[in-house]
């Protein structure tokens, strides 16, 4: 509901047009637009609000930029990968792991081996951040390759590979702060910080 409300508010207030002009002024290259709008902006939206919002907000922005509707939806759904575990300000980890596990039973077992719940919880979310961050290094390149192969004018994998250095750079700009935030700050901020740093650098 929130995503649809935000989208309609942006549409009727003229916000989508302003955002479209802003992104179109950055570059006319759709591959780069996909990396900035779908990947980095989508990761930020996922980190801030979660619950499928990137697909509901980023996809219409991509359509407004001139992407085919199906390509916009596919790219919007592919964002639902790396940032999701820390989406909605860490809700999946905080609620899913923090509330989903039997803390009493686990705490007894942890005390038996000289540990506690906080240490285990930190271990879980830091490992999730590292695992997803490393895999996330390849997601932007995969997104661009799928876009150029199935929705590009020439339907070519090579056109996607042509921007591989920029795609990997974009991924690293997101993944390094994402992993650092996941290890040192907690489960609330990795997706938000990774996306904001990535948007600032790229």
Predicted region positions:
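Membrane-core helix-loop-helix motifs of multi-pass transport proteins
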Residues: 65, 71-202
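Membrane-embedded alpha-helical segments and adjacent helix-loop junctions characteristic
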Residues: 1-68, 74
